[in-house]
């Protein structure tokens, strides 16, 4: 006698749909963070301090929001912010751009 096909668990299907939506949302947030970080570094290399610092602050804000919403772990967020600020500061110093008042003073 042929066996009946087992029914699918509805809650598992729903959780899967939710995870796919969450994955897309998290991917978009991480992509935006990477894009802004790269843009801030590029502007710092060009010596455009004001614009680089403005973009860096936006990236910092997105990183904090991602950590708040569990897209990024809080320690990973802190590490990314630290590395971004250090890189932007080094590039601006190398370009001879002023840093005081930009949130990167020593």
Curated annotation (Swiss-Prot):
One of its GO terms (cellular component) is small ribosomal subunit. The keyword Ion transport does not apply. Transmembrane segments: none annotated. One of its GO terms (molecular function) is structural constituent of ribosome. Coiled coil: none annotated. Residues 1-32 are annotated as: Disordered. GO terms for biological process: translation. Keywords: Ribonucleoprotein, Ribosomal protein, RNA-binding, rRNA-binding. InterPro entries: Ribosomal_bS20, Ribosomal_bS20_sf. One of the primary rRNA binding proteins, it binds directly to 16S rRNA where it nucleates assembly of the bottom of the body of the 30S subunit, by binding to several RNA helices of the 16S rRNA. Belongs to the bacterial ribosomal protein bS20 family. Part of the 30S ribosomal subunit. NCBIfam families: S20 (TIGR00029). This is Small ribosomal subunit protein bS20.
């Amino acid at each position: 006698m042929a066996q009946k096909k087992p029914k699918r668990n509805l809650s598992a299907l729903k959780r899967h749909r939710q995870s796919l939506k969450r994955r897309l949302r998290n991917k978009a947030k991480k992509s935006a963070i990477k894009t802004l970080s790269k843009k801030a570094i590029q502007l710092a290399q060009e010596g455009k301090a004001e614009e680089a610092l403005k973009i860096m602050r936006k990236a910092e804000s997105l990183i904090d929001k991602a950590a708040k919403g569990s897209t990024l772990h809080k320690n990973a967020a802190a590490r990314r912010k630290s590395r971004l600020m250090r890189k932007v500061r080094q590039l601006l110093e190398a370009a001879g751009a002023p840093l005081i008042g930009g949130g990167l003073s020593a």
